[in-house]
Amino acid sequence: VTADKIKTLSDIQYIPYTTKADLRDTYPFGMFSVPTKQLVRLHASSGTTGNPTVVGYTREDLDNWAEQVARVATAAGATQESMVQICFGYGMFTGALGLHYGLEKIGATVVPTSAGNTQKQLKFMRDFGTDTIVATPSYCLYLAESAKEEGHPIENYRLKLGLLGSEG
């Protein structure tokens, strides 16, 4: 497919795409478009329903990813003044590091607390003045409930922005 073949929205059907099944069927590196020696990072899904879905990133991929996250975070309201607590796991899950580097790119202060340890999350939010949170929507709800139970209602925190996702 060449660019001259794509003229209308309906022409998108001619663009080949990669499915999760494609990635699983060629586990681990069969669908990569560059040799593994050009990769600087690998991430993978948990593989609970089959082979893990492996994604490899080149330096250029990571730079582009950070730039895209920086743009999205800025559009959402994050700034270099933001104190951002990232509550996504920093393991093989691809989300935490992408957000981390994108937020650093705009000059925000990143607090990489990772997932879990709710009481420590809340303590850091209070003590550090966290104004932006990166988490799943359900974990944000759990944090609010836990804060109330601890006698520190979430309304008393400085939170004003949530970059939420990773739930289907």
Specify the residue positions occupied by each region the protein language model found.
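Gly/Ser/Thr-rich helix-start
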Residues: T48-N51, Y90, A96, E167
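Nucleotide 5′-phosphate-binding alpha/beta core
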Residues: V1-A44, G50-E67, R71-A75, T79-E81
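Short glycine-enriched loops at secondary-structure junctions
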Residues: L39, L62, G89-M92, S138
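Conserved AMP-binding loop of ANL adenylate-forming enzymes
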Residues: T74-V110
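Residue-level marker of alpha-helix boundaries and capping positions
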Residues: F32-S33, E60, G89-Y90, P112, ...
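Short, contiguous strand/loop micro-motifs
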Residues: P28-F29, G56, I86-C87, G107-T109, ...
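Conserved adenylate-forming
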Residues: A3-D4, A96-G168
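Conserved S/T- and glycine-rich ATP-binding loop of Class I adenylate-forming
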Residues: S45-T48, V84, I133, G162
